[in-house]
A protein has these predicted regions:
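Hydrophobic transmembrane signal anchors and adjacent membrane-proximal interface regions, especially
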Residues: 4-8, 48, 52-55, 132, ...
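S-adenosylmethionine/decaboxylated-SAM
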Residues: 60-64, 68-88, 94, 98-277
């Protein structure tokens, strides 16, 4: 009889125990998810601060400084909103890039050209912003894979396949957002794999370089190495998608490693990281 009672008790309590275990697992998963989302919002890890120091935009350029009345009028720029464009950057990031392009031109002597380079054209929307705000004397060079060049993509050992897929998916255009606009004559469109780029004509030429090509680690490393050689004294390099260890890990790991030998800063409220030569 006692054995029967024990079996009956186990039969009745087993579903309740299983439900409690499942509920505990779900609560733990929810807690981790909320903690991750909060960490992303604060731009820090679950238990640690991000390795690259976060600074206010005004730390990067006087054009991005604010007063109690609002942002500097030097940051007044022309952009079009993101509205879910493939591979796009946020409106705040667009404003910062556009303001830095404008500021780069303002630093040049009258009649002197400003030179800007972009790794990763995608739709050409950011390219348009850079050319439009840098002024009519600026020259923007932008590089992407053409749709018929996907076989030349050089996936590195250890690259995340998802980064490869995303890079090829965004290399789908031969006509761009800037095509047919009044800034198109200022833009030089290059097609090809960035790992094969001959930087001989680009050495120490550029005032501003935007690295937003493939986020696979081998490409971020290669593009960053090239950008360092292409940057002129006093110029800026900006990288996109420094979002913590959960997304774009190739960007995250490469920039954290680069920060060991170069002074990099992360712009608060964005996924942009900056290096000043």
């Amino acid at each position: 009889m006692p054995a029967c009672n024990l079996i009956l008790a186990l039969t009745l309590t087993a579903p309740l125990l299983a439900a409690c275990i499942v509920l505990s697992i779900l609560c733990l998963a929810l807690l981790i998810r909320v903690s991750k989302d909060r960490a992303k919002l604060l731009q820090r890890g679950l238990l640690f601060r991000w390795p690259i120091l976060s600074v206010d935009p005004g730390h990067i350029s006087p054009a991005l400084r604010t007063t109690e009345l609002g942002p500097s009028l030097d940051s007044l720029v022309s952009i079009t909103p993101s509205l879910g464009v493939r591979g796009g950057i946020s409106d705040l990031e667009s404003c910062i890039l556009a303001a830095l392009a404008k500021a780069a031109s303002a630093r040049e002597l009258p009649g002197t050209q400003t030179h800007i380079f972009e790794f990763g054209t995608c739709t050409g929307k950011t390219t348009h912003h850079l050319a439009l705000n840098a002024g009519h004397l600026a020259r923007v060079v932008t590089l992407t894979l053409a749709p018929d060049q996907h076989t030349t993509y050089q996936r590195g050992k250890g690259d995340d396949p998802r980064d490869t897929h995303a890079a090829l998916k965004e290399s789908a255009f031969t006509r761009f957002y800037y095509s047919g606009t009044n800034v198109e004559p200022q833009i030089t469109q290059l097609f090809g794999d960035s790992k094969a780029l001959d930087i001989t004509p680009h050495q120490a030429l550029y005032d501003l370089i935007f690295v937003d090509g493939s986020h696979a680690r081998s490409y971020v490393e290669s593009d960053s190495r090239l950008a360092m050689h292409m940057l002129k004294p006093g110029g800026l390099i900006l990288w996109h998608d420094y979002r913590g260890p959960w997304r774009a890990r190739g960007v995250w790991s490469t920039l954290n490693a680069l920060a060991q030998s170069h002074t990099l800063v992360h712009i608060k409220g964005t996924s942009l990281v900056v290096y000043t030569n």
